[in-house]
Amino acid sequence: MTPTSPQLTEHVLADRVLGGWLGRIAGNMLGKPVEQGEVWTRERIDRYLRQAEALPLTDYLPEPPSREMESALRSEWRACVRGRIHGSCRDDDVDYAVLGLHLLETHGSAFTTEQAGELWLLRLPYLQTFTAERAAYRNLVNGLKPPLTATYDNPCQEWIGALIRADVFGWTNPGVPRRAASLARRDAVLSHTGNGVYGAMWAAALVAAAFTARAPRAALDAALTVIPASSRLARVVRRVISLHESRLNWEETLATVEEETAGLGWIHTVPNAAVITAGLLYGDGDFTRTVTLTVRGGLDTDSNGATAGSVAGVLCGADAIPAQWTEPLEDRVRSAVFGFDGVRISELARRTVELAGR
């Protein structure tokens, strides 16, 4: 295997890909207990952390500081808070990375949207899909073909589901964001349209660019080139970049963008991309700061933490991710994807490296 970019030795590529997997899983686990944007606002998340004496946040969420806080957490919290983690929790944000790897191993980079749908039916349980993916799955079972699978009776076409499936296309195209975006688009149109598809293209390009970018801003700039400049997604990413450049602090930036995207809902691609962008910019390449700011930003916390963690993990590499994030994962993934439950994270990374640049 020859690394795609001349800047990446095989050792560096392997470290960065493993960093992407570890970062995605750790970021997902960090955000999972508070994944419900209409309940867990930025203010409430920080109130939880203050009551638990956990600000600044430098590790997984602490156990709930009160009965009132505990009752609002997702039921999986007991396996996702510090001191209780033994391997990853099962989550769709990780399932789709696993399934995407299997798609590329099975069909290669020339896979079709129809082949992606066939693998869903073969490998992914219907009740472990949500929102746009569940609508598309139902449409597949009823005999519809893409792109009708995305458009028929699917009110979630611009939600974040396609974005969370995109990382593997970046990991396998290091330093080549446009190619990563092309593969992500082919996958995304199974279930999404418009900004839902652009979100997947943007995320894949962002991850791919992180392999050779010197800083998060460079990766963000590269990712913007693969989506329409007039799209609402591109406009909100540029807006966050502009607010960051104007020296607003992180809280002020998110408050401004929250007001400007009001009404889209907490699972829509656009406001979540703003939270991810802010986490990356204000995290400034530091893994811990990036994932904690992103999750504290609220909305779809586990998805946002996963994507920001993937980008930050690629930027710094696995060796530079602090041990408090990686050791509790015990190199093990729980997955609903048939045949993959209990697979080692290091094994997933090794198989991803084998596909890089193909």
List the predicted regions and their residue ranges.
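Structured, active/binding-site neighborhoods that engage oxygen-rich ligands
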Residues: 1-358
